UniProtKB/Swiss-Prot annotation:
The lineage of its organism: Eukaryota, Metazoa, Chordata, Craniata, Vertebrata. It comes from Sus scrofa. This is C-C motif chemokine 25. One of its GO terms (biological process) is chemokine-mediated signaling pathway. Keywords: Chemotaxis, Cytokine, Disulfide bond, Inflammatory response, Secreted, Signal. The keyword DNA-binding does not apply. It comes from the Eukaryota. Residues 93-151 are annotated as: Disordered. The gene is CCL25. SUPFAM superfamilies: Interleukin 8-like chemokines. It is found in: Secreted. Belongs to the intercrine beta (chemokine CC) family. Potentially involved in T-cell development. Recombinant protein shows chemotactic activity on thymocytes, macrophages, THP-1 cells, and dendritics cells but is inactive on peripheral blood lymphocytes and neutrophils. Binds to CCR9. Binds to atypical chemokine receptor ACKR4 and mediates the recruitment of beta-arrestin (ARRB1/2) to ACKR4.
Length: 151
């Protein structure tokens, strides 16, 4: 057999085999187990959620709650009461954030639009100070990583 013919056969075999291997090894970020229950204090810190359907390597229907600290996520059973409550909280929060706020006051467009003067002195924008993670919040965040296997 000629070497170029062997090289063509190997190339065809690798070309046909590589997509199948790539599809099997594709990384899907999905839940493989449910969390039993998450306290309301932790659940209200979630910034979004996503429904997971059964497809591909994700063989468990779930609701995934995403938390801002260190890309944490919590998987819940869609029928659980705490999951329904969390979805309702986030839906209401997103609905409230997306709705434009109208008031009876008229603001003028200018370099300081949106800043109201509170006193006769100079006005300063309100600054909020955020503290770093505390020891107890790290402990609570570590509780989010434990899960109970689904049915």
């Amino acid at each position: 057999m000629r070497p170029w013919l062997l090289a063509c056969l190997v190339a065809c075999f690798v070309g046909a085999w590589a997509p199948a291997i790539h599809a099997q090894g594709a990384f899907e970020d999905c839940c493989l187990a449910y969390h039993s229950h998450i306290k309301w204090r932790l659940l209200r810190r979630a910034h979004s959620y996503q429904r997971q359907d059964v497809s591909g390597s994700c063989n468990l229907p779930a609701v995934i709650f995403f938390f801002p600290q260190k890309d944490k996520m919590v998987c819940g059973k869609p029928g659980a009461k705490w999951v329904q409550f969390g979805m309702k909280i986030l839906d209401n929060r997103n609905k409230k954030d997306s709705k434009p706020h109208h008031s009876g006051r008229r603001f003028f467009q200018g370099p300081q639009s949106g800043v109201r003067k509170l006193s006769s002195g100079t006005s300063r924008p309100l600054l909020l100070k955020f503290s770093g993670p505390t020891r107890s919040s790290k402990r609570k965040a570590s509780l989010l990583t434990t899960a109970i296997p689904g049915p």
